[in-house]
Amino acid sequence: MNGTNLIKIAVRALANNKLRGFLTMLGIIIGVASVITMLAIGQGSKRSIQAQISEMGSNMIMIHPGADVRGGVRQDASAMETLKLQDYEDIVDETRFVSAVSPSVNSSGQAIYGANNAPTTVYGISPDYLEIRRYKVEDGDMFTEQDIQTAAKVCVVGKTVVDNLFPDGSNPVGKVIRFQKLPFRIVGVLESKGYNSMGMDQDDLILAPYTTIQKKILAITHLQGITCSALKEEYTDQAID
């Protein structure tokens, strides 16, 4: 049976049962439309995720100490003391594919101002962290390298921290808040970034000199991490090597 005869038989079958033919065609149309819609949604989601990753820093590299295994039990990587300040300095001096580097230590606790308090996380970093994570200071200034050298008790805060501690809308710059009983003078407020694709509030944070957090809150000399930014996204692999 050739193709022409098959087409004739199919046409006669559809003509004899127009309702079935209509439903068959409708099913095909709906199926094709569904596939096109899902592809469009997939492309839209892909673009949205790519945009959010780019906002976080698509060329960002995070270095953490490897977790040790003792007695068959994997230890908490954050407790490892193998990552030193010298490692950070070596990256700054020797890596030609990296544009910005920041040490990283952090601690969670209550931030307090007057009668207001809220749980948050303080990140001990260097000013390069803003470039790496694409944060901008909206009001006031970023703390300086001099503040790092002196382990100054200064900080820059996110909008969520401002809303929680200053619900009356007063300007927080110049005010002194407390974190784990340690006073910090606010020198700047970050521009809002909102929530990321994982549902994390990128404005619920305090940034302070890493030396201050190391010495006066954590009482450690090692680093919990190093965050870098490759010169270009395509240089990320070379920077890691």
Predicted regions located by residue number:
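N-terminal Sec/SRP start-transfer signal
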Residues: 1-30
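Amphipathic alpha-helical segments that mediate coupling or scaffolding at interfaces
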Residues: 10-13, 28, 44, 48, ...
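Conserved amphipathic alpha-helical interaction elements at protein-protein interfaces in regulatory
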Residues: 13-16, 20, 51, 55, ...
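Short, strongly hydrophobic transmembrane alpha-helices
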Residues: 19-47
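Hydrophobic, regular-secondary-structure patches
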Residues: 43-121, 125-131, 163-164, 214-215, ...
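Short, glycine-/polar-rich solvent-exposed loops and beta-turns at beta-strand/coil boundaries
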Residues: 55, 147-149
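Mid-to-C-terminal secondary-structure elements
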Residues: 128-143, 152-240
